[in-house]
């Protein structure tokens, strides 16, 4: 929403995915990138909208600095999950019981949906009117595709911040310069 407001203030024309459902390219950042170019995204709370844009793109290019690279997704950045407000505590318990997420601690995000840090006493609400659960891991997720599938098939889960096999290329800024992984 902030980007939309800034674009309007600057007179930049906007359109919608309903009008143009195929994009040549989408460019975005990521919270974590594993060696297979799987991603954790949505730390800012817009994971569903981000995923909807990326699936409409013929190419999805990710730009990160080298601190976002990891050996396995999970322990470096909480995995956000967007859930419905209705029966949200039940959904939280279901997520906590998923076999592929053993060892994770699901926590309802409090405060601003755009911060993965508690910055208020109210439950964080997304632009879609849903809640965010942050999954905190001490070990990397062992089977990322299975975790993504189990989350997606959990009643009450709208979507998750695991972006599996979606990136075409990752542009990485590091201490030795910029390089691309495909």
Predicted segment positions?
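Conserved phosphate- and dinucleotide-binding cores of soluble alpha/beta proteins
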Residues: 2-182
């Amino acid at each position: 929403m902030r980007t939309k407001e800034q674009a309007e203030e600057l007179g930049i024309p906007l359109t919608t995915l309903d009008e143009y459902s195929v994009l040549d390219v989408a460019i975005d950042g990521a919270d974590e990138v594993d060696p297979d170019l799987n991603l954790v995204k949505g730390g800012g709370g817009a994971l569903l909208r981000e995923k909807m844009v990326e699936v409409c793109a013929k190419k999805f290019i990710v730009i990160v600095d080298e601190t976002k690279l990891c050996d396995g997704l999970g322990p470096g950045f909480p995995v956000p999950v967007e859930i419905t407000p209705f029966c949200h505590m039940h959904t939280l318990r279901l997520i906590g019981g998923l076999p592929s997420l053993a060892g994770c601690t699901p926590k309802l995000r409090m405060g601003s949906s755009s911060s993965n840090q508690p910055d208020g006493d109210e439950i964080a609400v997304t632009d879609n009117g849903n809640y965010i659960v942050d999954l905190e891991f001490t070990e990397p997720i062992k089977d990322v595709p299975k975790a993504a599938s189990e989350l997606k098939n959990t009643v009450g889960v709208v979507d998750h911040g695991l972006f599996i096999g979606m990136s075409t290329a990752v542009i990485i800024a590091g201490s030795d310069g910029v390089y691309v992984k495909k």
